[in-house]
Amino acid sequence: MGSKTAENESQGGGNAPPSSTKATATGGEPRGAHWSRDGDGTLGEGEGDDDADGDNTSCAPAVPLNPQTAPSTNSKKRKKRPKKKTSALKQSSPPRIPLADLFPDHQYPHGEAQVYEPGLENVARTTADEVRHHSRHHIEDDTFLNDYRKAAEVHRQVRRWTQESVRPGQTLTEIAMGIEDGVRALLDNAGLDTGQGLISGLGFPTGLSLNNCVAHYTPNPGQREVVLDSSDVMKVDFGVHINGWIVDSAFTMSFDPTYDNLLAAVKDATNTGIKNAGVDVRISDVSAAIQEAMESYEVDINGRTFPVKAVRNITGHNIEQYRIHAGKSIPFVKNNDNTKMEEGEIFAIETFGTTGRGYLFDGPGVYGYGKDPSAPKRITSHLASAKSLYQKINENFGSLVFCRRYLERLGVESYLAGMNNLVSNGYVEVYQPLMDVRGSYSAQFEHTILLRESCKEVISRGDDY
């Protein structure tokens, strides 16, 4: 889930001209080079062989009876059928089998471990740095890591189903609810009872942003129903949390090869950002590498060639418990931010590329809401509906971002006046869709990484991206 920067906020070198199109770039590849390897961001067939399912079990030849010990009776002896191997439990489609049933030992797959770039000086820390580091010691805790890896595996299995099953003609509501129902089923937590949503669930509303809508669109009650078209480019952005620690990962789907290079540019830029991220790395260095990779691509649409531009006023971000945007931002363009990444931090490394202007504005409607983490536990308000709604938010979402669909799923009614009161008093922040110019197309790829002591773990990495 991208973090929008304040309007007109300076990002240092953000006004520098985009780098020219070229065959190679830092972390980049020539235009179109990815597609012989990466495909279009969707999962391939590669399921491997199915020998383990027991279907190919061979029968051992029967051993003849020893004539000396064979019984003298002529009665026929019933042959025992060979036992079939128990087939491994596989995820259903749509995904509904709790992950704990698929992993009975409750040990979940590790993310991709990347070594830090050589030459980084990771030992010279100030006292303040050491204090912050010790406050993040949980990142090496086995229970924390296993829970976080479980959330990542839930994300992988649900997005695999999404990539295999979502097709033009489906409504965005149908797609969003399929993703969200899958997440809840795999976590074995419907989230309907008070407090359940704080234990595990969706990290934020499922984003399904089409074409020039770059980010932060989710279908909500009262909106016009949108049907996915074969010409659409759809960003799919959803989060899975356990105990408030959110795995934030996103990908882009298209059904027309016209947009392959757009997807390739953004996927390359995201992987370049991951490669350059690390302990004690300056954010400005990561941003510069992202922009250089992204803007080395162009895309041909209807006979016109468009450079792929890095979006300038939305960023990657660090993640803290129950906070999807925790304060540090990673722009996708050159800047003068000398803030460093630190050991023990968690980052959502994401990039957005567009054929449009690369500057976003608020679109119509509402994506979701999020309680200000610094807001008080209880409020005083002359509006009873505002107080009861605020209590409902605290009990079910805390500071997690949520949407109207989630409120109505909990049975909350007549909440708009109370919500407007909470927003106007600064207790709750409202998020709107973010748009580029009409007629443009945009893409997004995103992973969550943990800056551990010995490596950076790309916890959401999968075979797909």
Swiss-Prot record:
Family listed: Belongs to the peptidase M24A family. Methionine aminopeptidase eukaryotic type 2 subfamily.
Predominant place of localization: cytoplasm
Listed GO biological process terms: proteolysis
InterPro entries assigned: Creatinase/aminopeptidase-like, Met_Aminopeptidase_Type2, Pept_M24, Pept_M24_MAP, Pept_M24A_MAP2, Pept_M24A_MAP2_BS, WH-like_DNA-bd_sf, WH_DNA-bd_sf
Organism: Penicillium rubens (strain ATCC 28089 / DSM 1075 / NRRL 1951 / Wisconsin 54-1255) (Penicillium chrysogenum)
Listed cofactors: Co(2+); Zn(2+); Mn(2+); Fe(2+)
Catalytic activity entry: Release of N-terminal amino acids, preferentially methionine, from peptides and arylamides
Subcellular location: Cytoplasm
Chain intervals for the UniProt region annotation (Disordered): 1-100
GO molecular function, one term: metal ion binding
Positions of substrate binding: 216, 325
EC number(s) reported in the record: 3.4.11.18
Cofactor: binding details: Binds 2 divalent metal cations per subunit. Has a high-affinity and a low affinity metal-binding site. The true nature of the physiological cofactor is under debate. The enzyme is active with cobalt, zinc, manganese or divalent iron ions. Most likely, methionine aminopeptidases function as mononuclear Fe(2+)-metalloproteases under physiological conditions, and the catalytically relevant metal-binding site has been assigned to the histidine-containing high-affinity site.
Entry binding sites for a divalent metal cation 2: 248, 317, 350, 446
Protein name per Swiss-Prot or TrEMBL: Methionine aminopeptidase 2-1
Keywords, alphabetical: Aminopeptidase, Cytoplasm, Hydrolase, Metal-binding, Protease
